[in-house]
Amino acid sequence: MTRRLLVAAAALALAACASTPQMQMPPDIAAKVKAIGPVIDPPKTAAIYAPLQPKEPYAGVRVTRDLRYGPDPRQALDVFAPDRVVSNAPVLMFVHGGAFVAGNKRGPGSPFYDNIMLAAARNGMVGVNMTYRLAPQHKWPTGAADVGAAVKWVQDYIRAHGGDPARVTLMGHSAGAVHVASYVAFPEHHRAGIGIARAVLVSGLFDFTKLTPPGKPEAAYFGGLAGTAQVSSLAGLLKTSVPLMVAYGEIDPPMFIEQAKLLNEALCAQGRCPRLVYLPGHSHMSEVYAVNTDDRSLSGPVLEFAR
C-alpha cells in the first residue's frame, strides 16, 4: 500500500511539473524581458507581446465601448462579455497604470488592455476596463473616487451585460493598484457599500512614507501630501474584510517588490495573509502584457481568485 501511494504521489508530482511550462514565461520571451531589465518601458515590452495578442474583431466576445460612468471624457469604460448568452457571471474590473499622469484603457492599434478583458470573457466572465482622470490636473483622491464611480456603474448596470454585481473582482496595476488600494482602504469612497467581492493589487504602492523623497509622479498626484501616511493605503488595507491578492514581478523595480512584501508581511502579522503571487521572469509591464497569451503566470491565479 505504501509503495502504491508513493508511486501515485510521484505520478501526480510529475504531472504537475509537466503542466508548469505551459503556465510560465517561454524562455525566448524571458530572455527579451530580462534584457530590458528592472525598468518601466512600455514601448519595448509591448513590442515583445503585441504580436502574441489577437487583433479585432475578437471572435466569441461581445465588446461595448466607451460607456460613461461620469461627465469627464476620461470617465469611461469598456465591457467585454462572452458572445453566448450569460447571466450572473463573475465580473473582473481592471484599472490601468500610468504613473498617475498617463495611460488609458486602450490605445490606438494596441492590444493592451483589451487582452485582460479577453482573458476574462473567454473564461466565462464579464470584463470591465475603465480609465480615469489624470494628474496633475486631477489630484488625490480623484483616482479612488473614479474607481468608486465606476464600481457604482457596475452595480447599477452590469446585469444587462450578463454580470453578477455580487461577484465583482477589482484589479489594478501600478498606479491603478494604488487607486484600487485607496478605494478599498478609505471608507469615504464606499459609504453606500463597497460593491466588490475581492481585490487584486498588481505591483502597487501602499506605504508612501517609505518612498522619500517622493518621485515626480507621486508629487504630481499627491501634491503636498506626497510621502505621507495620509495618502497611504496600508493602514486601511489592514482593516478591510475584502479578500486581497497581491502580485509582483521578479524584475519589477525594487520599490514595487519591497511594497508588495511589506503589505504581505503586515497582513500575515494579523493572521490574514493575502493570496501572494510571485511572477518569475516578469517585469513591471510584462506581467500584464502577457495576459491572454500561453503564459498564464498572472492570469491563471487571477481568474481562479475571481470566480
Give, region by region, the residue ranges found by the protein language model:
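Bacterial N-terminal signal peptides that target proteins for export
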Residues: 1-6
